[in-house]
A protein has these predicted regions:
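A long, amphipathic alpha-helix that forms part
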Residues: 2-41, 102
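Active-site rim elements
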Residues: 3-16, 60, 80-90, 103-111, ...
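Generic, ordered loop/turn and secondary-structure boundary motif
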Residues: 21, 38, 53-54, 59-60, ...
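Histidine-centered active-site microenvironments of extracellular/periplasmic hydrolases
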Residues: 31-84, 88-91
Length: 185
């Protein structure tokens, strides 16, 4: 049985890891400032997954509920608008075309059109309020876990888990993913 004390200590350890990473990022930014490189350096902070910390009785990362699949992307790019906060759906595949476009001084690079991701520069720069808000993810591990896939399009999320009913959620109206819409007409 998992006790409340176990849950508290696990969450405390997780938040401690976040604080540790935050401190290290602060040191990197200070070094960039001390060497006068901050104004010409793009910084992206992302994670490949979140963590289930007892929500729904689940632990770790092997699912696609929001606690595990929804992670922030923080970008600091010289010349870009500051303080933009958005719930637009992005994906790690969007980073490569974004970085290529930054490296080319924001000139459109024809080769990025062939990449799976989409440059976030129009959005980050404030020129566009919307991008193709789709994210696709999958998880497969040999062992007790079964293949799982997720498609997120705007406020809707579809989760497929082999051998289990599909799950479809409207995250705008059901942010805790409690009402499965997959059988609704």
């Amino acid at each position: 049985t998992i006790t409340e004390e176990h849950i508290r200590k696990t969450r405390q350890a997780y938040y401690g890891m976040i604080s540790y990473v935050d401190e290290k990022i602060g040191k990197i930014i200070k070094l960039l400032e001390d060497t006068n490189q901050r104004d010409n350096t793009a910084i992206f902070f992302v994670s490949d997954h979140g963590e289930m910390l007892g929500e729904r009785g689940m632990w770790f990362k092997q699912c696609f509920f929001e606690w595990s699949s929804h992670v922030p992307m923080i970008a600091s790019i010289p010349g870009a608008s500051k303080g933009i906060r958005s719930s637009v759906v992005t994906s790690l595949v969007d980073l490569l075309p974004t970085i290529i476009e930054i490296g080319n001084n924001s000139k459109k690079e024809p080769s990025i059109e062939k990449l799976a991701g989409k440059s976030l520069i129009p959005f980050i720069s404030g020129f566009s309020k919307d991008i193709n808000s789709t994210a696709i993810s999958d998880y497969y591990h040999i062992g007790p876990c079964v293949p799982t896939r997720m498609v997120r399009k705007n406020e809707f999320k579809l989760i497929y888990t082999h051998g289990h009913p599909n799950l479809l959620f409207d995250l705008k109206n059901d942010p805790n993913e409690l009402k499965n819409l997959s059988d609704d007409e």
